[in-house]
Design a protein with these regions (language model features):
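Hydrophobic alpha-helical transmembrane segments of multi-pass membrane proteins
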Residues: 79-82, 112, 116, 148
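Short, flexible segments with low predicted structural confidence
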Residues: 84, 100-101, 166, 171
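Interfacial segments of alpha-helical transmembrane regions
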Residues: 101-121
Length: 250
């Protein structure tokens, strides 16, 4: 229960901060129509579902074992590794559409910044919980099963696609989430994750992207407030992961 309390405190604090930001009036075009706090209810419930499975023997954990048994019984030799590249496909679609000239919510620079922030938040939270939970994978390979990183990545990407193009092209959003769901299913069919790993991973991914749409405009405005100091905040990829590069002239 100590693990659950620590994670619960972290998420409660995050949601309080996001609620404060979401309720602020914002006159800039970048911050228009940011996700409201109510949009975090479903992904938070998904994370909560997964956290309950860490509490020991309960109905949710039992469902993990029965789901694994059924999948292994029906498809004992299943092996398909499309999930390794599918996890990035919704985000790749966003940038492909932007390069093709299809207008979304943001210009490509801001979209890249939002996505980099989402990936940074998602990777940090997932990596921390993998080390904290030390859950063994269903194939008994390693103890870093919870939550599913592939699923978190693809759902963060699917939410990114939805936020950028879902209003004008709803079918694009549906396609992104269909790909995300298929990726999560493949993680279980390949015997790499439990059901609760996948469900929690989906929640972490969605929360990371929604939070980035709230926090990125605040962070960008913070560094551009002083016009006499030329600051530039740019997304970057280094040391095997996404991040930000800040430069400035004083």
């Amino acid at each position: 229960m100590t693990k659950l309390r620590r994670v619960a405190v972290m998420f409660s604090s995050l949601l309080i901060v996001l609620n404060c930001y979401a309720q602020e009036k914002d006159s800039t075009s970048l911050a228009k129509k940011t996700p409201g706090i109510t949009s975090f209810i479903l992904p938070t419930a998904l994370v909560g579902y997964g956290l309950i499975s860490l509490a020991g023997n309960n109905v949710i954990r039992d469902l993990d074992f029965t789901t694994k048994a059924e999948l292994q019984e029906d498809h004992p030799l299943f092996a398909a590794h499309a999930d390794n590249f599918l996890q990035f496909s919704p985000a790749a679609a966003v940038f492909a559409l932007k390069f093709a000239g299809v207008k979304g919510r943001h210009q490509i620079g801001d979209a890249a910044g939002i996505y980099a922030m989402s990936m940074t938040m998602m990777t940090g939270s997932v990596t921390y919980l993998k080390k904290l939970s030390k859950r063994q994978r269903p194939d008994n390979s390693v103890n870093n099963s919870f939550p599913s990183g592939h699923t978190a990545t693809v759902f963060a990407s699917a939410e990114f696609l939805k936020q950028e193009y879902g209003k004008e092209y709803p079918w694009i959003a549906y396609t992104g989430y269909a790909v995300a769901t298929a990726t999560g299913a493949l993680r279980m069919y390949n015997n790499r994750h439990w059901l609760s790993d996948v469900i929690a991973g989906a929640g972490f991914g969605i929360i990371s992207t929604k939070a980035s749409y709230i926090l990125y405009p605040k962070l960008k405005r913070l560094f551009s407030r002083n016009q006499t100091s030329a600051f530039n905040l740019m997304p970057t990829y280094q040391s095997g992961g996404p991040g930000f590069y800040l430069s400035g002239n004083f």
